[in-house]
Curated annotation (Swiss-Prot):
Coiled-coil portions: none
Record protein name field: UvrABC system protein C
Family indicated by similarity: Belongs to the UvrC family.
Domain UVR: from-to ranges: 204-239
All residue ranges annotated as the GIY-YIG domain in the record: 16-94
Keywords, ordered alphabetically: Cytoplasm, DNA damage, DNA excision, DNA repair, Excision nuclease, SOS response
Lipoprotein is among the record's keywords: no
Keyword tRNA-binding: no
GO molecular function terms listed in the Swiss-Prot or TrEMBL record: DNA binding; excinuclease ABC activity
Purpose: The UvrABC repair system catalyzes the recognition and processing of DNA lesions. UvrC both incises the 5' and 3' sides of the lesion. The N-terminal half is responsible for the 3' incision and the C-terminal half is responsible for the 5' incision.
Signal peptide: none
Chief place where the protein resides: cytoplasm
GO biological process: nucleotide-excision repair; SOS response
Length: 614
C-alpha cells in the first residue's frame, strides 16, 4: 500500500485524542512529524482527494507507513512534536537549521578566586550565569570590557595554581592578580560581586558608587586609586554604550521578526536581558516555498525553546499559528507565565521595527550570497564533471605537531555557504599509526566517517551523503582514501573524490587537482571557482588547526589530580573546592585530605604519596 491507502488503513485504529503522528517513506525515512488535538480528525484530512498544497500532496504520495503517539493534552503533543522534528529532521517539516547553544558569561564561584569566562552547555558549574548572548563575539566584547572594569581572572585553575608572579594581564590592568595575593580575598570577592551586579542591570548604581569613591580618593590625594576607579568607570560606560541600554526598562525579553522573499525566510532574534540588548542572531529555517510566515514562525519558536528556558516576554513581528497553544506550552516548560505579544506602539514596537529591518537586510544578503554560491557550485560541477551542482561538499584536513594531539577535521559547504553545525572533529585514536603519518590519519578519518554514513544511508538518511569530497593533499592522500573506501565496499562511483595539492613552491594559485583514473590538472589563477576551492581548503585547514590547538590546550591544562587513580570529576571538584587549588591539595596532610567528602584514608594516603614521593 502507498499514499492515501496507507493513511486510510491507519485511520481505522486511531483514537480521537491528542497526539503526534509520523509519516514514513519508502526507505523508512521520516517524511513528516505532526501534532493534533484530535488524531483521527487531523489525519483524516489527508484522505481528501483535493485541496492540498503541492507540498502536502507530494508528502501524501510518498507515504508508505505511519506511527502514532497519544498524549494527555495538545500542549504535550506540541512539545513532543518539536523534540521529534529536531532529532529526526523530517523532509517536509520546518526545521531550525543552526540550532547551536548560545553562549553565556559565567562568574564561577567554586574557587577562592572567582573566574569569569564564556560558557556554553548545561549549567553544571557553581556560579552566576548571565545570558544568553547572541554570539561568541558579543560575549568576548563584553568580557574584554568587564576585565578592564572589574579585574577578574580568566585563567583556568591549573594555570592559576601554578603562578608564582603576576601574568601579563595584571601588567596591562586587566586582572587584580589574586593568584599571588596582590588583592585580598575579600576585595577580590567584592569585585566579582560588582561584576555580577553590573550584568544584572545595576550598572547605574555601580557607576554612582564608584564615582563617589573616586572623588573621596582624589580628596584624600590617593591619586593612583582615583585613577584606577576612573578607568573602571570609563570601562563600564563603554559597555553600556555598546550594548544599547533600553531606556524604557524592558528587563527581559526575546524579540523575533520574520522576513520572507522568494520562498526563503529569515528570523531575526534579539536578546534583551537586564535591560540591555545582548546581541542579535539571524536564522534561516528550512521549509517548503509554499509555507506561510505564521506557520514558519510557530514551528521556529517551539523548536528554538526546546532546550532553552524562555524569558517572561516574547515579542513577535506577527502572530504565529496557534499562538495561545505555544504560549501555554512554553509556560508549561518554564513553570511560570509566559507572555507572547505583537505590540502595536511604543518602545516594544520600535524594538520590533528594528528587528524587522535587520531581518530584511540579512535576508537580502543571504539571497545575494546564495545566487553567487549557486553560480560557483555550477562551476564546480563543470570542473569535476559532476552530474549536477553539488549540494553537500565535504573537505578534510589533518593537524598535529610531530604526530602529537593529532586531529582530523571535516567542514561542510553547500548552496547556503558553510554549514558550521555540520563540521566534525576526529581525534586520532589508532595507536598503531606512526607519529606524523598523514596517510594513516586520513585513513582513520575516512573509515570512521563513511562507516557511519553507510549505516545512516541504510537507515534511510541520505541527506548527509556527500556529493563531492575534497582532500587537502596530493596523489598519495587520494590513493590512501581510495584504499580505505574500497575496504568499506565503496567505489569512486559512490563517492566523488578530489585531492588538492599545492605547487612545488606551495603558492596559492598553483594548485593541482587529482581525480581517480584521470590526469591531474590546474585551473586558471584568476578563475573564481579556484578562489572558491581555495576558500574551502583553507576553511578545513583553519578548522583542523583549531581542533588541534584545543586538544593541545586541554592536554596542557590537565590537573595533577587527573593522574591519581580513584579521583574522578566529583572528588576532583570536592578537593579543589576544599583546598582552593591543586597546589593547595599538594601541600595537605593525610588528615586534612580525609576531611574532604568522598576521600577515605586509603585515597588520602595515595594522594599524599603522589605529591610527596620524591
Amino acid at each position: 500500500m502507498r499514499g492515501v491507502d496507507v493513511i486510510k488503513e491507519n485511520l481505522k485504529h486511531l483514537p480521537s485524542r491528542p497526539g503526534v503522528y509520523r509519516m514514513f517513506g519508502e526507505a523508512g525515512e521520516v517524511l513528516y512529524v505532526g501534532k493534533a488535538r484530535d488524531l483521527k480528525a487531523r489525519v483524516s484530512n489527508y484522505t481528501r482527494m483535493g485541496g492540498h498544497t503541492q507540498r502536502i500532496a507530494r508528502m501524501i504520495s510518498l507515504t508508505r507507513a505511519m506511527e502514532f503517539v497519544v498524549t494527555e493534552t495538545e500542549t504535550e503533543a506540541l512539545l513532543l512534536e518539536a523534540s521529534l522534528v529536531k532529532s529526526l529532521k523530517p523532509r517536509f517539516n520546518v526545521l531550525l537549521r543552526d540550532d547551536k547553544s548560545f553562549p553565556y558569561i559565567l562568574i564561577r564561584r567554586n574557587h577562592e578566586a572567582p573566574q569569569i569566562k564564556k560558557y556554553r552547555g548545561s549549567k553544571q558549574d557553581e556560579g552566576d550565569y548571565f545570558g544568553p548572548f547572541a554570539n561568541a563575539g558579543a560575549v568576548m566584547r563584553t568580557l574584554d570590557t568587564l576585565q578592564k572594569a572589574f579585574l577578574l581572572r580568566t585563567c583556568e585553575d591549573s594555570v592559576y595554581s601554578a603562578r608564582t608572579r603576576p601574568c601579563m594581564l595584571h601588567q596591562i590592568k586587566r586582572c587584580a592578580a589574586p593568584c599571588v595575593g596582590l588583592v585580598s580575598k575579600e576585595d577580590y570577592t567584592a569585585l566579582a560581586d560588582e561584576a555580577a551586579d553590573f550584568l544584572r542591570g545595576k550598572a547605574g548604581e555601580l557607576q554612582k558608587r564608584l564615582a563617589s569613591e573616586m572623588e573621596a580618593a582624589s580628596e584624600a590625594m590617593e591619586f593612583e586609586t582615583a585613577a584606577r576607579l576612573r578607568d573602571r568607570i570609563r570601562a563600564i560606560a563603554h559597555v553600556r554604550s555598546t550594548q544599547d541600554v533600553n531606556p524604557d526598562g524592558i528587563e527581559e525579553a526575546d524579540v523575533f521578526a520574520i522576513a520572507m522573499d522568494g520562498g526563503v525566510s529569515c528570523v531575526q532574534v534579539f536578546f534583551i536581558r537586564a535591560g540591555q540588548n545582548w546581541g542579535a542572531s539571524a536564522h534561516f529555517p528550512r521549509h517548503e516555498k509554499d509555507q506561510t510566515a505564521p506557520e514558519i514562525l510557530a514551528a521556529f519558536l517551539v523548536q528554538f525553546y526546546d532546550k532553552r528556558p524562555p524569558p517572561k516576554l516574547i515579542l513577535v513581528s506577527e502572530p504565529p499559528d496557534q499562538a495561545d497553544l505555544i504560549e501555554e506550552a512554553l509556560a508549561l516548560k518554564a513553570g511560570r507565565r509566559i507572555e507572547l505579544r505583537r505590540p502595536e506602539r511604543g518602545t516594544k514596537r520600535d524594538l520590533l521595527t528594528q528587528a524587522e529591518r535587520n531581518a530584511s537586510e540579512a535576508l537580502s544578503r543571504k539571497l545575494a550570497e546564495s545566487a553567487s554560491q549557486e553560480r560557483l557550485l555550477t562551476e564546480v560541477q563543470k570542473v569535476f564533471d559532476l552530474a549536477e551542482a553539488p549540494q553537500r561538499i565535504e573537505v578534510y584536513d589533518n593537524s598535529h605537531i610531530q604526530g602529537t594531539n593529532a586531529v582530523g577535521g571535516m567542514i561542510v559547504a553547500g548552496p547556503e555557504g558553510f554549514r558550521k553545525q555540520a563540521y566534525r572533529k576526529f581525534n586520532i585514536k589508532d595507536t598503531e599509526i606512526t607519529p606524523g603519518d598523514d596517510y594513516g590519519m586520513m585513513r582513520e578519518v575516512m573509515r570512521r566517517r563513511f562507516a557511519r554514513a553507510m549505516k545512516e544511508k541504510v537507515a534511510g538518511n541520505v541527506s548527509d551523503w556527500p556529493d563531492l569530497v575534497l582532500i587537502d593533499g596530493g596523489l598519495g592522500q587520494l590513493n590512501a582514501t581510495l584504499e580505505t573506501l574500497a575496504e568499506l565496499g565503496l567505489t569512486p562511483d559512490d563517492v566523488t573524490l578530489v585531492s588538492i595539492a599545492k605547487g612545488v613552491d606551495r603558492n596559492a594559485g598553483r594548485e593541482q587537482f587529482f581525480r581517480p583514473g584521470k590526469a591531474p590538472f590546474k585551473l586558471p589563477e584568476n578563475a573564481p571557482v579556484l578562489y572558491y576551492l581555495q576558500r574551502l581548503r583553507d576553511e578545513a585547514h583553519r578548522w583542523a588547526i583549531g581542533a588541534h590547538r584545543q586538544k593541545r590546550a586541554a592536554e596542557a591544562a590537565r590537573s595533577p589530580l587527573d593522574e591519581i587513580e580513584g579521583i574522578g570529576p566529583t572528588r576532583k571538584k570536592a578537593l579543589l573546592h576544599h583546598f582552593g587549588s591543586a597546589r593547595g591539595v599538594s601541600r595537605a596532610k593525610v588528615a586534612d585530605l580525609m576531611e574532604v567528602d568522598g576521600v577515605n584514608e586509603a585515597l588520602a594516603i595515595r594522594i599524599y604519596g603522589h605529591f610527596n614521593s620524591g
